[in-house]
From Swiss-Prot:
Pfam families registered for this protein in UniProt: Ribosomal_L7Ae
Record keyword Protease present: no
Predominant subcellular localization, coarse grouping: nucleus
GO terms for cellular component: box C/D methylation guide snoRNP complex; nucleolus; precatalytic spliceosome; small-subunit processome; U4/U6 x U5 tri-snRNP complex
Subcellular location: Nucleus, Nucleolus
Biological process according to GO: maturation of SSU-rRNA; mRNA splicing, via spliceosome
Signal peptide: none
The protein's assembly and partners: Component of the U3 snoRNP particle. Binds to the C'/D and B/C motifs in U3 snoRNA. Component of the 25S U4/U6.U5 tri-snRNP particle, a subcomplex of the spliceosome. Binds to the 5' stem-loop of U4 snRNA.
Gene that produces this protein: SNU13
Family stated for the protein in its record: Belongs to the eukaryotic ribosomal protein eL8 family.
Name the UniProt record assigns to this protein: 13 kDa ribonucleoprotein-associated protein
InterPro entries: eL8/uL1-like, H/ACA_rnp_Nhp2-like, Ribosomal_eL30-like_sf, Ribosomal_eL8-like_CS, Ribosomal_eL8/eL30/eS12/Gad45, Ribosomal_eL8/Nhp2
Source organism of this protein record: Eremothecium gossypii (strain ATCC 10895 / CBS 109.51 / FGSC 9923 / NRRL Y-1056) (Yeast)
Phylogenetic classification of the source organism: Eukaryota, Fungi, Dikarya, Ascomycota, Saccharomycotina
Length: 127
């Protein structure tokens, strides 16, 4: 396992944004607004129910999730890489590493404002 993130992992969140993203992921997991794994993230994008996509930059090989940024750009959904798949797995509430996760849409959600705040920050990274 390498300590340097893959250069293909762009945009990579800084430490503060990573913490904020993982906090929202944890809350979304409790609210049943989270899909874990590259396959489920792909399904949410195809169904049009994804707010944003989080991917792990230390995924090995990184190519197994590089179809997601292309799909995100087609569907106009923001995406971001976080440095650690283990931290993403913990935030998702599972004991295994998670390489991709999707926050899903729910207008009646209690954490809607936090989701939109993080979504805006991710969108500024993509510009």
């Amino acid at each position: 396992m390498s300590s340097t993130p893959n250069p293909k992992a762009f945009p990579l969140a800084d430490a503060a944004l990573t913490q904020q993203i993982l906090d929202v992921v944890q809350q979304a997991s409790n609210m049943r607004q989270l899909k874990k794994g590259a396959n489920e993230a792909t399904k949410t994008l195809n169904r049009g129910i994804s707010e944003f996509i989080i991917m792990a930059a230390d995924c090995e090989p990184i190519e197994i999730l590089l179809h997601l940024p292309l799909l995100c750009e087609d569907k106009n959904v923001p995406y971001v890489f976080v440095p650690s798949r283990v931290a993403l797995g913990r935030a998702c509430g599972v004991s295994r590493p998670v390489i991709a996760a999707s926050i899903t849409t729910n207008d009646a959600s209690a954490i809607k404002s936090q989701i939109y705040a993080v979504k805006d920050k991710i969108e500024t990274l993509l510009i």
